[in-house]
């Protein structure tokens, strides 16, 4: 069940990046606009759910939900910067190396045992990503750097999610993730908040909606992992 939900999450995250790139191909869009709309829309959904179910807004572990929110915001911001400066393929392939960083951090943070063969899988994963990306070391693309940094921070964000899931419900984690993300990115889009007109605007909203769905699936999915 958990694996299936994570697959759905990556499906929606991938479509979010495609829509973001399509919007940028029509008109230059501030990368933080995609991030802000994702978090603001998600905040609205999480708030409505908590109010309708009359659930408490108070988490048991403030430190974990705040860590999850801050790390995820940084990761998503870096990811959309990557999309702006490199191809969708490179951005997604680099970002999808985040499980390797989860693998590295988990034994130290969550005290999970790692089998020795896992390190070989880690090496193959990193080499495979490098082959697909085909980096030019004489002229490093800044977008690729953002993509790799996004994966690193995302790995830490997933580890914090694993810890938070031990104490909090999925909705509480999502609520604070979206709230923190909205607050941290608002300053980058206001007072010049503009959604592009026409088709580009629809792509921007589609990217935000797919991002929210991906965030929901990945948060719930790790409940079963």
Residue ranges and their predicted role:
Residues 1-32, 138-163, 206-209, 213:
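Glycine-/small-residue-enriched transmembrane alpha-helix faces in small-molecule transporters
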Residues 2-9, 54-78, 142-150, 195-213, ...:
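Loop-to-transmembrane-helix transition segments
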Residues 10-14, 18, 40, 47, ...:
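Hydrophobic/small/kink-forming positions within alpha-helical transmembrane segments
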Residues 25-33, 78-95, 168-171, 218-225:
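Structural motif at transmembrane-helix junctions in multi-pass transporters
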Residues 27-74, 153-157, 176-192:
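Transmembrane alpha-helices of multi-pass small-molecule transport proteins
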Residues 79-81, 98-120, 192:
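C-terminal transmembrane-helix exit sites in multi-pass transporters
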Residues 81-89, 134-142, 166, 191-198:
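Membrane-interface helix caps and helix-loop-helix hairpins in membrane proteins
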Residues 117-133, 154:
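Hydrophobic transmembrane alpha-helices of multi-pass small-molecule transport proteins
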């Amino acid at each position: 069940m958990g694996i299936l939900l994570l697959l759905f999450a990556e499906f929606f995250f991938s479509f979010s990046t495609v829509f973001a790139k399509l919007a940028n191909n029509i008109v230059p869009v501030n990368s933080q606009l995609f991030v802000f709309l994702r978090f603001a829309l998600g905040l609205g959904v999480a708030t409505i759910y908590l109010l309708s179910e009359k659930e408490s807004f108070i988490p048991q572990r403030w430190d974990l939900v705040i860590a999850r929110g801050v790390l995820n915001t940084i990761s998503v911001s870096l990811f959309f910067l990557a999309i702006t400066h490199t191809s969708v393929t490179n951005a997604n392939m680099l970002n999808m190396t985040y499980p390797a960083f989860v693998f590295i951090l988990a034994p130290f943070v969550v005290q999970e045992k790692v089998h020795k063969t896992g390190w070989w899988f880690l090496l193959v994963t990193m080499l495979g990503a490098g082959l697909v990306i085909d980096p030019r070391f004489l002229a490093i693309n800044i977008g690729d750097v953002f993509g790799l940094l996004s994966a690193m921070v995302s790995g830490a964000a997933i580890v914090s999610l694993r810890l938070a899931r031990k104490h909090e419900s999925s909705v509480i984690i999502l609520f604070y993730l979206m709230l923190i993300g909205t607050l941290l990115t608002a300053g980058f889009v206001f007072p010049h908040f503009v959604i592009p007109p026409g088709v580009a605007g629809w792509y921007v909203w589609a990217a935000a909606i797919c991002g929210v769905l991906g965030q929901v699936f990945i948060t719930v999915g790790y409940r079963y992992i």
